[in-house]
Swiss-Prot record:
Keywords attached to this entry: Cell membrane, Cell wall biogenesis/degradation, Glycosyltransferase, Membrane, Transferase, Transmembrane, Transmembrane helix
Species annotation: Exophiala dermatitidis
Disruption phenotype: Leads to strains that are hyperpigmented in rich media. Does not affect growth rate at both 25 and 37 degrees Celsius nor the virulence in a mouse model. Affects the separation of yeast cells with enriched chitin in septal regions and increases the frequency of enlarged cells with multiple nuclei. Leads to increased expression of CHS2 for compensation.
GO biological process: cell wall organization; chitin biosynthetic process
Transmembrane segments: 577-596, 616-636, 656-676, 732-752, 764-784, 864-884, 911-931
Protein name, per record: Chitin synthase 1
Functional summary from the UniProt entry: Polymerizes chitin, a structural polymer of the cell wall and septum, by transferring the sugar moiety of UDP-GlcNAc to the non-reducing end of the growing chitin polymer. CHS1 mainly responsible for normal yeast cell reproductive growth.
Enzyme Commission number, as recorded: 2.4.1.16
Biased composition (Low complexity): 44-66, 957-976
Cell membrane as UniProt keyword: yes
């Protein structure tokens, strides 16, 4: 049998010297240039002599081919470094030789060496048609040698078996388990000094985590460590201290040290694998599109190296098990690694890092390079506790963002399926304009296969609502430069714009303020405002001192998302949206003076003030929407009581009006009672909410019929009596026509202008039928639950053990409990009870808990809010109805005229802003196209030589257009600079 310490492969040979402990003294890393004949991911080999065939029993030793080959000089390093790459070295351990060799053979098989001898098949596995090397070394007449082996000596002499030289001590540590552990995941927790002189308590398993063998077998690339190893880090600090404590990501260390241009955040709670894969596969398709832009300065074939995807799960006990299975299938996650405590410190998050080359689509089928999938750098952060979405964003921005310093950050929710070019269009908005701090994509409702989801009126109404918002509201706000909300489901931010000033005040500090609000210090106004914390972030960006950031709507970047399809889920979602939007709008209006301290131009400030006026009017209409709904119904249906226009005759219209009026009032009162006392998720209350919705359907449908009858009758009466003057705005027919045309008509017009009119034919009827429910049910429920500032994902799951426990014994039919067994114990307890009754000992009252104080405070404020809301709407409704009683001529009703014409004016204002958005985009596209064509004609195109001739360097955008920023987000040349350059060139 060949002595073990002389075993080498037929691929390489390396000589090392050792210290007394048997550990490697050589710290120098030798890197040979790759040879054409080497396999993917292997170091080049020294040529072997063909006259020395390999023995079938043991591997041969390489022969010297040329005489000019010299032995590498002995290293001069006396001792090993204390750590490698920020991770501490292990102390020398001793292991059973059989375990070591079996682990070595497994690793040799994993990297294509077949486990014994040379195997030309790079995907070969151990034990397939050949005798395993570890058995060849151990078997000697049926006997196995006993004894121990120093790890360092063995590995650096024999690690070539899997085709790559190990130049790091961490590789040595990763070949076998640590003492006392039989798995391949082990790595002890150590403390190492960081750059600040403190200590870093980390459990790093970077070198330990091989990817599964099956996954490794079909990977197209196995030439880098990031493709063959998964890195795990147990984080024991707060996300704000991630960088300070010395934690690093793969993009900060070693050969994977790279700059990050695009950082994508995917937040999830308990979504299943279908929702996760539809989002993740959409991201992978977007990354493939980035890599397909070969003419880009920023992107190209290796563009994936500038993109990092971070998936953050909110709570280890909350994440869906099948979602973890999907991540494991991609190689990003491995079970059995994570620990709760490291160095007596509680772990706050488990961070897994891997560069995956496969993707799972919605049908859970693998997609790889054959389908255009490119590598994707992934970070999976599994939070130990459920601390809500805001905390997940703090991990993203303050922990991983500070480590990577990206240019653009994109936020996605699990369940959102981005279009294949959506992320590129979002990034492009920042590349073309250095003043853009945030961008919003278009959110579309998932209509299901074959649009069958529209058969549900709730889904159809939300589809219409989303479409109108993306056609009228978002373009209008984008023209002014301030979008009230960038949806967390699909939005992007410039990382530099989010940073706080030296004093610590800025967008991110205000954004994360809502996470630290506790107890009575968290007033109801602030707590509800931070239910829509993304609105606060938008405002802080636009109003940032001494800056001129703007927000932009990118209609070409769209993604589909699931919408609630049940009434309880829909009501709960809108409760959070409505309360957050209302209080955030109040916050922005109260602090509008911050705009004066910005560096915006005078024109921009004027536009922003116009938008504030528009938002103030919209806020008033929202607050008094309940009274306006009742008054509109009161006057339109009350016109039936006028005998001169009663379409039914015999005072039937009056009786119908009285019945409908009482039903409407009773339903509104019932809505307040239900909102104050019940949850939508309650089984008994669901039917009541459905009944409420259907009652409103009937009322609204009848109102529409009444309107049609009255409009027709009024028009006929005007035709029969031409002697009466027909003044615009002086009759109900004109008011109703103008109001209807300004809403429904403009909806149709703008939808056709944006070439997206299908929702008007498939979803408009459902929306208008559900409109009373939007006003009454949703708005009332939101104001009646201002005390509820949760996201509905947090509960008390802690089990108290102060009463002890009962343990089952035997077959499980009997339990064992601790009971007072001595008679003395029983008598003393009885004596204490009698003495307390006789002396009337005062029982101390337990102090009120902080949670109870907070709940009482929130509910008391809720009472004031609901009372104010009810009183204000009731006063308005009663005052106007008394001023214009039933039977009075409806044409002289000035309040109804004001309401209807205000609706028309607001709709027209939205249409003008939306049209301006379209015109600006068209003009910008034409201007950019002409400048690009002139640039290519003068300077020879957008290639590197043409840019050098122009002297523009990196001032142009990635496609050669007049981008204002470079790929790294630094400010470049303005349009005037480009124009002057062209003029100088022409003049020369």
């Amino acid at each position: 049998m060949v002595p073990f310490w002389t075993v080498v492969t037929d691929q390489h040979i390396k000589y090392t010297s050792h210290n007394k402990a048997g550990f490697i003294i050589d710290e120098e890393q030798h890197h040979w240039p790759p040879s054409s004949g080497s396999s993917l991911g292997r170091a080049p080999s020294i040529p072997l002599s063909s006259s020395n065939p390999r023995s079938p029993i043991r591997p041969s030793t390489p022969s010297r081919v040329s005489t000019d080959w010299t032995r590498p000089p002995a290293p001069s390093v006396a001792y090993e470094a204390r750590d490698i790459n920020g991770s501490p070295r292990l102390e020398p351990h001793h292991h059973n030789m059989e375990e070591v060799l079996e682990g070595l053979c497994h690793r040799a098989a994993l990297f294509g060496q077949g486990g014994c001898g040379r195997n030309d098949n790079p995907n070969a596995r151990a034990g397939v048609g050949k005798r395993c090397l570890c058995r060849s070394l151990l078997d000697n007449a049926g006997q196995r040698p006993k004894g121990k082996l120093e790890i360092g000596t063995f590995v650096h002499d024999c690690l070539d078996l899997y085709g790559r030289w190990c130049h790091y001590q961490s590789e040595v540590e990763s070949l076998w388990p640590s003492a006392g552990r039989k798995t391949r995941y082990a790595r002890p927790s150590r403390s190492t000094n960081d750059q600040e002189g403190g200590y870093v308590d980390q459990w790093r398993a970077d070198s330990r985590m091989y990817i599964p063998t099956i996954l490794h077998s079909f990977l197209p690339r196995r030439d880098e460590r990031e493709f063959t190893h998964m890195r795990y880090t147990a984080v024991t600090c707060d996300p704000d201290d991630f960088v300070v404590k010395g934690y690093k990501l793969r993009q900060n260390i070693g050969p994977t040290m790279r700059e990050t241009e695009l950082f994508i955040c995917v937040t999830m709670y308990n979504e299943d694998e279908i929702e996760f894969t539809r989002t993740m596969h959409g991201i992978m398709r977007n990354i493939a599109h980035f890599c397909s832009r070969t003419r880009s300065r920023t992107w190209g074939k290796d563009g994936w190296q500038k993109i990092v995807v971070c998936v953050i799960a909110d709570g280890r006990q909350k994440v869906h098990p099948r979602t973890l299975n999907a991540l494991a299938a991609m190689g990003v996650y491995q079970d059995g690694i994570a620990k709760n405590v490291v160095n007596q410190k509680e772990v706050t998050a488990h961070v897994y890092e891997y560069t995956t080359q496969v993707s799972l689509d919605e049908t859970l089928k693998f997609k790889g390079a054959e389908k255009g999938i490119v590598p994707c750098q992934m970070i999976f952060c599994l939070k130990e506790k459920n601390k809500k979405k805001l905390n997940s964003h703090r991990w993203f921005f303050n922990a991983f963002g500070r480590a990577l310093i990206p240019n653009v950050c994109i936020l996605l929710d699990v369940g959102t399926k981005p279009d294949s070019k959506a992320l590129y269009h979002l990034w492009k908005a920042f590349d073309q304009n250095s003043n853009v701090a945030g961008a919003a994509g278009e959110i579309k409702a998932d209509k299901g296969k074959g649009w069958l989801g529209l058969l549900n009126p709730l889904v159809a109404s939300q589809n219409f609502e989303y479409k109108i918002s993306n056609i009228l509201d978002k373009p209008l706000e984008s023209v002014f430069g301030y979008i009230t909300v960038l949806p967390g489901a699909l939005s992007a931010y410039r990382y530099h714009a989010l940073q706080n000033d030296p004093s610590g005040h800025g967008p991110l500090s205000q954004y994360f303020k809502g996470e630290t609000l506790h107890g009575r210090d968290a007033d109801v106004f602030t707590a509800n405002m931070y239910l829509a914390e993304d609105r606060i972030l938008c405002w802080e960006l636009v109003a940032k001192r001494d800056e001129q950031w703007v927000l932009k709507f990118v209609k070409s970047a769209y993604g589909e998302t699931d919408v609630p399809d049940t009434v309880p889920e829909f009501i709960s979602q809108r409760r959070r949206w409505l309360n957050g939007a209302f209080f955030a709008a109040v916050y922005a209006l109260v602090h509008f003076k911050q705009i004066w301290r910005t560096d915006h131009s005078l024109t921009r400030k004027i536009l922003l003030h116009i938008e504030f006026i528009y938002q103030f009017i919209s806020l008033l209409f929202t607050f008094f929407s309940l009274a306006n709904f009742y008054l509109t119904f009161y006057f339109v249906a009350g016109s039936l009581a006028d005998p001169t226009i009663d379409p039914f005759g015999h005072n039937i219209g009056k009786y119908i009006f009285v019945i409908l009026r009482y039903v409407c009032v009773l339903l509104i009162c019932l809505q307040f009672i239900l909102s104050l006392g019940n949850r939508p998720q309650g089984e008994e209350i669901v039917s009541e909410y459905h009944g409420d919705v259907f009652h409103h359907h009937g009322i609204h449908d009848l109102c529409l019929r009444v309107y049609c009858h009255q409009a027709t009758y009024d028009a006929r009466s005007r035709k029969d009596r031409p002697q009466q003057s027909y003044k615009l705005g002086n009759n109900i027919f004109t008011n109703l026509i103008v109001s209807s045309v300004s809403t429904i008509g403009l909806f149709f017009l703008m939808s056709f202008l944006y070439l997206d009119p299908w929702h008007m034919f498939t979803s408009s009827a459902q929306y208008f039928a559900l409109l009373p429910s939007y006003i009454c049910t949703l708005q009332v429920y939101a104001f009646c639950n201002t005390h509820d500032v949760t996201w509905g994902t947090k509960g008390d799951n802690v089990m108290h053990t102060d009463l002890g426990a009962a343990k089952a014994i035997g077959s499980g039919n009997t339990v064992e409990v601790e009971m007072p067994s001595e008679q003395l114990d029983i008598d003393s307890a009885y004596d204490v009870a009698l003495r307390n009754l006789r002396d009337r000992v005062e029982v101390p009252k337990p102090p009120v808990s902080e949670n109870q104080l907070q709940e009482d405070y929130y509910k008391s404020v809720r009472t004031y809010v609901v009372a104010s809301y009810m009183v204000c709407n009731a006063i308005l409704a009663m005052a106007v109805s008394e001023a214009y009683p039933v039977g009075s001529h409806i044409g002289s009703n000035f309040y109804l005229t004001f309401i209807l014409w205000s609706v028309a004016a607001l709709a027209l204002f939205r249409a003008i802003g939306s049209s301006a958005f379209g015109v600006i985009n068209i003009v910008s596209a034409i201007a950019e196209g002409r400048i690009q064509a002139k640039f290519e004609r003068i300077f020879g195109g957008g290639d590197e030589r043409g840019r050098h001739r122009a002297g523009l360097g990196s001032g142009f955008s990635e496609s050669g257009k007049t981008g204002i920023t470079s790929g790294s987000g630094m400010s470049g040349m303005s349009l005037s600079d480009v124009t002057s350059k062209i003029s100088e060139k022409l003049a020369g």
